Regions:
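Short loop/turn segments immediately following the C-termini of beta-strands
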Residues: 33, 54-56, 92, 101, ...
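Hydrophobic core register within WD40 beta-propeller blades
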Residues: 87-89, 130-132, 173, 217
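Beta-rich catalytic cores
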Residues: 15, 83, 102, 126, ...
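Surface loop/turn motifs at the tips and blade-to-blade linkers of beta-strand repeat domains
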Residues: 10, 75-80, 119-123, 162-166, ...
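Short coil/turn segments that connect the beta-strands within blades of beta-propeller domains
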Residues: 48-49, 92-94, 135-137, 178-180
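Conserved N-terminal segment of EGF-like repeats
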Residues: 1-65, 69-85, 100
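Short coil turn/linker residues within repeat-based beta-strand modules
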Residues: 66-70, 103, 113-115, 146, ...
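Residue position within the beta-strands of beta-propeller blades
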Residues: 52-53, 98, 140-141, 183-185
Length: 221
């Protein structure tokens, strides 16, 4: 007996996504990032409450609202990761973007690992910081090897240099596209966190005391 046979709605085993047969029956399951609803047949249509983390040679995802307390985080199936560093996610397109300092590239893929591609690779050395502007669909990044902050469209085109003067080892970067500001850290001899317009203008220091290695920063919108 085929417990995952298609029904009248063309659903295998009555499951909206994955049907997993077992010895006595079958179990419905969901792709990475989606949650099985109470009917035990239907998956949510969009991911919700996710934690996405980079661990050098893999990128993992965990559902924070999972009904299964024993569920572990899942490895997103990506190829040839060498040293992933910065990571961001676009909820509109369901794509993740990450920098790989081992390969000196900026890459993207869908949350299920499909359509993996490199979007920026020329002229990069150590792209340690990455931020997605979801309003105008731009990528901002820092490069501690070229001492630059740059921007490009999310497909890597229309690339532009924003800040290069008086940068020693720019590290992390976050953006606030609603207000038109970006914030970044710099591991200079006297470390600093600065702000600037998203076009690189109006640059100023906002934190310059009691800093050592300001690796990660975030913003409260």
């Amino acid at each position: 007996e085929n417990r995952c046979a298609e029904d009248k709605r063309k659903l295998k085993g009555g499951c909206s996504h994955l049907c997993l047969p077992n010895r006595l029956s079958r179990r419905c399951a969901c792709p990475i990032g989606l949650t099985l609803l109470d009917d035990q047949k239907t998956c949510t249509t969009v991911p919700d409450k996710l934690l996405i983390l980079a661990r050098k040679k893999d990128i993992r995802i965990k559902q924070l609202d999972s009904r299964n307390s024993k569920e572990v985080d899942n490895n997103i199936p990506l190829d040839n990761l060498k040293s992933t560093m910065a990571l961001d996610w676009c909820s509109k397109t369901d794509r993740i973007y990450w920098s790989d300092v081992g390969k000196s590239t900026i890459n993207r893929a869908y949350l299920n690992g499909s359509n993996q591609e490199t979007v920026v690779q020329d002229g990069l050395v150590s792209p340690a910081g990455l931020a997605l502007d979801w309003v105008t669909n731009k990528l901002y990044w820092t490069d501690a090897g070229t001492y630059r902050i740059e921007v490009a469209s999310i497909d890597g085109t229309q690339r532009a240099l924003l800040i290069w003067q008086n940068l020693h080892k720019p590290r992390d970067i976050v953006v606030n596209p609603m207000q038109g500001y970006m914030f970044f850290s710099d591991w200079r001899s006297e470390p600093v966190i600065e702000s600037a317009g998203m076009d690189g203008s109006k640059r100023k220091s906002i934190v310059s005391e009691n800093l050592y290695y300001p690796t990660g920063i975030t913003i409260d919108y």
